[in-house]
Amino acid sequence: LAPGGATATAWRMADEVWDAIDREAGTGVRLSAAEHFVTITDHELVTSRGIHARDVSTHLAVEIALIARAEAGSSDDEAETFRPVEARRLADLRLSAHVAEAATFARDTLRAEATPTHDGAVVIASGALPALFDPFLFHTGAQAAVMKLARFAPGDRVTDGGDPLHLASDSTRPFGLGSHAFDGDGVP
């Protein structure tokens, strides 16, 4: 967290969003709404066998809605885009980059047209990849396996053909959204 705690961190997040919006001035994009969330969690685990462990973690989330207009003052041609951003550290939020990308997306939406039928390679923007892989992350996780909901086991093929897709997860990665000293059951 920023010096000064959760409140100071929330203000720094808001300032970064406003600064990024100011850089979009004159492009037809404005901020419609923004919400900032700072959560500090302090877990303490004490067992009858003498184990005593503590895990203090942060979770930062920002939700940004931007509106692009084709012409200044006109509400006939508008496009809105919503961007949720989450991280454990302020530096990992990269709010300026997310605002710039969302502003570009909103402007591009104004010019978007239906594409002709296409047979070939498809390029997926970096922002779309997390949503694309969310089901794989769930089905390869230990929680889904224990709950008997996992579709995949180690070594299983994800697709019937084509190039293999190898998925790996590291819950010990520092400051990952799912990285903690121990889970809710006290397992390290």
Model features per residue range: what roles?
Residues L1-H180:
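Active-site bordering "gate/hinge" segments
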